Swiss-Prot record:
Gene3D superfamilies: 1.25.40.180. Residues 1-26, 669-699 are annotated as: Disordered. This is Nuclear cap-binding protein subunit 1. Belongs to the NCBP1 family. Keywords: mRNA capping, mRNA processing, mRNA splicing, Nucleus, Phosphoprotein, RNA-mediated gene silencing. GO terms for cellular component: nuclear cap binding complex; nucleus; postsynaptic cytosol; presynaptic cytosol. GO terms for biological process: 7-methylguanosine mRNA capping; mRNA export from nucleus; negative regulation of viral genome replication; nuclear-transcribed mRNA catabolic process, nonsense-mediated decay; primary miRNA processing; regulatory ncRNA-mediated post-transcriptional gene silencing; RNA splicing; siRNA processing. It holds the Pfam family MIF4G_like_2. Component of the cap-binding complex (CBC), which binds cotranscriptionally to the 5'-cap of pre-mRNAs and is involved in various processes such as pre-mRNA splicing and RNA-mediated gene silencing (RNAi). The CBC complex is involved in miRNA-mediated RNA interference via its interaction with Ars2 and is required for primary microRNAs (miRNAs) processing. Also involved in innate immunity via the short interfering RNAs (siRNAs) processing machinery by restricting the viral RNA production. SUPFAM superfamilies: ARM repeat. It comes from Drosophila willistoni (Fruit fly). Component of the nuclear cap-binding complex (CBC), a heterodimer composed of Cbp80 and Cbp20 that interacts with m7GpppG-capped RNA.
């Protein structure tokens, strides 16, 4: 009998567990269905948005009792992650609030919490979208206009804070201004005087703020034909135009207007007092930017008009397109399809808007959000999806860029070169070059012939020399790159007269016979220590002829491909290290690479990158070599600056890596100490898994890591000091010589060089910022020429 009872109990327990699993499974299915319904509401379907909303409200109202928290979370997530559907979700919340006032209050509290968390965690876009959502809830009679105005006023209070960065004050003003298109009309009708007071406070702030950073962020130095407006100035002009139009805009869909009779009966909630978190030194705010303009209505053919530069519709369209790129940039095909599927495409010249926004992203200063190739690949997909119109618009844009290239920012010039060469490589290198042949009459350093020359160099990397030669008209012969072959001087006709030729030939035979590094060292010993005709460095630290013979011979033998060169360097790594003991010796190695491969820019880039990775040459040696007299003829060529930037990036990555490792080690040490101190107090059931001895770093290890990081920081600072000091020297010398000779200093060479200085500041702004006070003290002093000093001051203003 007892056995029977036990069996019955087992069956009951099994049934209970099975039913519980079934309930959990059913609940999960319902939650997934609710999430799917909420996410897809308002998307294109057979029924209208309004009927979709009505049906969804009925479903959600029935499930509020069981799935309240889930629904709250999904809706607040949608508010932040799908800002393009803001008004759809605010209408949904408004209808739910009209039926269930308690739920409406809970949602407002949840949204306020999301907003405050976003501010606290420096999630600035999420905070702005949350604020927009709260503002649009005023239109749906969920939140009172008075309490929203109090929040907006509190945010504008930040503009009066002292001793905080301007970028902080700017962001809070921008967040308020960018919210007004959604709620401005309602505030104008209900609280006109309070709205005007808010706008007056904003105007006062905008009139007194510094715009020292503006010139550093411009794509073009000229304002013709389109002004290069600072982002807050542009948005303020758009808001003023909207105010002149009595806050009536034509872009934002407002489904809540259909339900006005229902929504106006609902009780409203008041927002609690929200105080923005105070500034902290660790906070990073969005940097300012310049609004990019390429087209106006005169550039577009017959069809819908392009909204004016100061119409709020232009801001709303551009923001929406930027968000589509942000959401889909990992999938170029999806991104292109979504851009072409823009909801209001029949009201605007969509292709022009898309092309302008993509180039705005590509030319964004100080750096684009994504890799250059991301934008190039999206444009290619757009051309494939819309072959009838988009290639023509893109060709028109390219023509505009080329004609305005004289005043283009140097960083943007590089990006334009990289994009155009990549684009040509995907369309059989076809272009109407004859239309640009007027540039052949200009000086070689002028941006137009320089652009074509650099494009052809990049095309060479994506094709081969004969193909480049065949695709270009004969008139462009002087701009076509040289055939990329090594210039091995020990095989030339004059080689017999060169010191080291005999040893070079011995080395060729030995390497082909697969000799060891030790055998190479023995062969090089035959070169006398006096080197070139008795010439030697004053400190006797290296033998230039040994380096010359070894580097040129080895790399010439490995010239068949990158892989052959890499294999040669790796095999004789020890010989390189022995020869490159000093910075002067490393510079000598770099000079020999240039002498051998001066006609093959890409080979130089990849070889120097390899030498840096193998720590054969130091970053400081590369920087010094770039500014050496031997490289004067190459100074305005893109590849040289590509080498400098990859060198700086390598140093930056090294510092970041050491910083991360030290931080992790300190965390482990701290956790191990706290774990051991807590272990005696914890009961056996509460005791956590202890950190093992193997996981715990010793204090000595941490100290060594700190020393490594300190040394890396010193090297990084030294690298930047070398680069900026050399810039100051050559620019100051040019300005002084021009003044002495009575010549205009504003030459093409000067513009390229000052542009490269600015590029180093902006491309590596996060790292350079750490040393700004040192740079100001040692290099960028008040007695420096104002042209050079302004570049530094503009850089500092970016984070001021």
């Amino acid at each position: 009998m007892s056995r029977r009872r036990a069996h019955d109990t087992e069956d009951e327990g099994y049934d209970h567990r099975r039913n519980k699993r079934r309930r959990v499974s059913e609940n999960q299915e319902i939650e997934d269905r609710l999430e799917s319904l909420i996410l897809r509401v308002g998307e294109r379907s057979t029924s209208s948005v309004e009927s979709n909303l009505e049906g969804l409200v009925s479903v959600l109202e029935a499930d509020l009792g069981t799935f309240r928290l889930k629904i709250l979370r999904i809706l607040s997530d949608c508010a932040v992650r799908m800002p393009e559907k803001c008004t759809v979700y605010t209408t949904l919340v408004g209808l739910l609030n009209a039926k269930n006032y308690k739920f409406g209050g809970e949602f407002v509290d949840h949204m306020v919490k999301t907003f405050k968390e976003s501010l606290k965690l420096c999630r600035w876009d999420a905070a702005r979208y949350s604020l927009r959502f709260l503002a649009d809830l005023v239109n749906c009679h969920v939140i009172s206009a008075t309490s929203l105005l109090q929040l907006l006023d509190t945010m504008i209070d930040v503009s009066n804070e002292d001793t905080v960065p301007q970028v902080r004050r700017d962001w809070f003003v921008f967040a308020v201004l960018s919210t007004l298109p959604w709620v401005g009309r309602d505030l104008y009708e209900k609280k006109e005087s309070a709205l005007e007071s808010l706008l007056l406070r904003i105007e006062v702030y905008l009139n007194k703020r510094s715009k020292k950073h503006h010139n550093a962020l411009r794509v073009w130095s000229s304002d013709a034909p389109h002004p290069q407006e600072e982002y807050l100035d542009c948005l303020w002009a758009q808001i003023r135009k909207l105010r002149q139009d009595n806050w009536a805009e034509k872009h934002i869909p407002r489904p809540y207007l259909v339900f006005d009779s229902i929504l106006c009966e609902a009780l409203q909630h008041n927002l609690p007092q929200i105080i923005p978190p105070p500034h902290h030194d660790a906070f990073e705010y969005p940097m300012p930017w310049v609004v990019y303009r390429m087209f106006d209505y005169t550039d577009c053919p017959d069809g819908p008009n392009l909204p004016g530069a100061h119409s709020i519709e232009r801001f709303l369209i551009e923001e929406h397109l930027h968000h589509i790129i942000e959401t889909h940039h990992y999938e170029r095909k999806d991104c292109a399809a979504q851009l072409l599927n823009f909801p209001f495409k029949h009201k605007i010249p969509l292709e022009y808007c898309i092309v302008e926004v993509i180039f705005a992203e590509l030319f964004h200063m100080p750096t684009p959000r994504y890799l250059d190739i991301c934008y190039g690949s999206i444009l290619i997909e757009l051309c494939k999806l819309q072959p009838g119109t988009l290639p023509q618009v893109l060709a028109q844009a390219t023509e505009i860029l080329f004609m305005r290239i004289d005043s283009m920012n140097t960083s943007c010039f590089d990006r334009f070169v990289n994009w155009f060469s990549y684009h040509l490589s995907n369309f059989k290198f076809t272009w109407s070059w004859d239309e640009w042949d007027s540039c052949l009459l200009l000086e070689a350093e002028h941006p137009r012939p320089k652009f074509i020359q650099e494009v052809l160099q990049k095309c060479l990397r994506l094709s081969y020399h004969q193909r480049i030669t065949e695709m270009m008209p004969t008139t462009y012969a002087k701009l076509i790159p040289l055939t990329p072959v090594p210039n091995y001087k020990y095989a030339n006709e004059e080689a017999a007269n060169l010191p080291g030729t005999t040893v070079a030939h011995q080395l060729v035979v030995a390497i082909r016979q697969k000799c060891t590094p030790e055998e190479v060292v023995n062969i090089l010993k035959e070169i006398p220590s006096s080197g070139y005709s008795g010439e030697e460095m004053s400190d006797g630290s290296f033998n230039a002829l040994k380096i010359d013979v070894f580097v040129q011979t080895l790399l010439n033998l490995g010239s068949k491909s990158f892989s052959h060169s890499f294999a040669a360097i790796s095999k004789f790594h020890a010989v390189f290290r022995a020869l490159a003991e000093t910075e002067e010796a490393q510079i000598c190695i770099l000079h020999n690479i240039f002498e051998l491969w001066s006609s093959h820019q890409q080979m130089m880039v990849v070889l120097i990158d390899k030498l840096l990775k193998l720590q054969i040459v130091d970053c400081s040696a590369v920087a010094t070599w770039i500014f050496s007299k031997e490289m004067t003829g190459e100074f305005t060529k893109m590849y040289l600056w590509e080498i400098l930037h990859l060198t700086i990036k390598k140093m930056n990555k090294h510092v970041i890596k050491l910083n991360t490792e030290l931080s992790d080690a300190k965390d482990k040490l701290s956790k191990a100490d706290s774990s051991s101190s807590d272990s005696d107090e914890d009961t056996p059931h509460k005791r956590k898994k202890p950190i093992t001895h193997a996981d715990k770093p010793s204090e000595e290890v941490v100290e060594r890591m700190e020393e490594k990081l300190e040394a890396a920081n010193v090297n990084q600072k030294r690298l930047f000091l070398i680069v900026f000091q050399r810039f100051i020297m050559i620019l100051s010398e040019h300005l002084l010589r021009s003044d002495t000779d009575g010549r205009d200093p504003d030459t093409d060479w000067y513009r390229w060089t000052i542009g490269r200085l600015q590029q180093v500041f902006l491309m590596h702004h996060e790292q350079v910022q750490k040393y700004s006070s040192t740079l100001e003290t040692l290099l960028f002093t008040s007695d420096l020429d104002t042209h050079i000093l302004e570049v530094f001051q503009q850089f500092v203003a970016l984070r001021a």
